[in-house]
Amino acid sequence: MSKPGNEYLCALAQMGDTHAANLLLEYNLGFVRKTANEIFLKSNLVESDLSIEIGDLEQEGGIGLLKAIPGYDKSVGVKFLTYAAPFIRNAMTDLVRDSFSQYEQRMVDPQNGLGFQKVRLDEILPGEERML
């Protein structure tokens, strides 16, 4: 017995079949993982301080896929995964962007609004003569 196609599962999910939505997610998990890996590497998250792991991106991608279900229209002639791909990718990039924004806010000093610590040269080089 062959597995049902994405378009058929999407139609069932649009009618409220949660099992079909879960199968749709399961059958397309490979694409979600591949996309998560691409974004993880391209965003250089390995060396960042954002604390985002590939699993986080995969979860967001799965949510993106599920959000694509209600708007999919088979009569347009586009395959479901082609339609859902931007939803998946955007959900992942939104996570990265939002995390980066939160990271930037933590870096900003509330008193002077700068993203770095204000330091006087005299504090760094005490007792040194001025070069001016």
Language model segments and positions:
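Alpha-helical promoter-recognition and RNA polymerase-docking modules of transcription initiation factors
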Residues: 1-102
